[in-house]
Amino acid sequence: MKKNYIFTFILLLSIVGISAQTIVSTTAENKNAIVEESTGIHCSYCPDGHAMLNQIVDQNPDDVFVIKFHEGGYAWDCDPNGGHDFNNSIANQLNGIVGDGGVQPSASVNRQVFSNYSLTGGTAMSRSYWASAISQVLQESAYVNVGVEAELSGNVLTIHVEAYYTASSPQSTNYLHISIMQDETIGPQMGADSFNPSYIVSSSPNPDYQHSEYDYRHMDRLVDMVDGINGDAISTTSVGSFIDRTYTYTLPDFYNDVPVDLSEIEVAAFITDGSEIINGYKVETTPVGYDVAVVSIDSPSGNGVYSDNEN
């Protein structure tokens, strides 16, 4: 007698090592724009930069991705009770790479030097040039595509990255970088009421803040990078090379004195040639549950096989 059973698993197959298909395109594509913005709580024009980038992302939702790093003299906590120290060593190192000269808001687009837009001869640009630089990057061909997915079990992130080289890199070694960000961190922001009021969540200035700033939604906030600022070396960069790597990262309870909200973690993966970002992608994390409900069984299933391929 045939028994019909259907298993409903609230569990992603990849967490048990079953892989049905790749997550990266093997067709030649143009670059995505990875925008790294230097910002700070006490940068009064930074909310204007946030609003500008929000609009650009809305117009290019699958092609433009933003990472905001808090550093410099404007990135200090004005709350006597603490809880808003968004600065970190990775942000400080990143500032050394993009070279904003202390100007905020500023941003780097794919870490390219746009000589007509550059603030100090490096990759950082003032906000009046961001849209133009992003538009140029989106029209450039990429020799590598990047796919990423991130699963969260408890406070442990499992990050799966695939890359495919549709053409050979001019460099024999490339680098894979993984940024971890947190959305929806509520805290003070100078200039929010003037330049990005839609991100204000308080009806009046917060008297606990030293300058009576409003409570503001801090989005895309860089908290760490897997393998640090230098990334993970890729030594097979010729046409047809397929990269498949999985990383685990344990999220702490706090970064500095800022609580971690596990439901608001994002992950970006991008590949550089040692300086410029060639391509990348950004995703929200997917929570992984372990509840199993048995409804019915149809027939025995085969064994799942997981392969870790890189060639």
Residue spans for each PLM region:
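Short, conserved sequence motifs used for protein processing/export or organelle targeting and
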Residues: 51, 62-291
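Generic recognition of flexible, low-complexity loop/linker segments
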Residues: 22-23, 254-257, 301-302
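Long, low-complexity ectodomains and other extracytoplasmic segments of secretory-pathway proteins
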Residues: 287-305
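Local sequence-structure signature of Cys/Sec-based thiol-disulfide redox active-site neighborhoods
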Residues: 24-72
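Bacterial Sec-dependent N-terminal signal peptides
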Residues: 1-27
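Short, solvent-exposed loop/linker segments at the N-terminal edge
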Residues: 150-156, 300-310
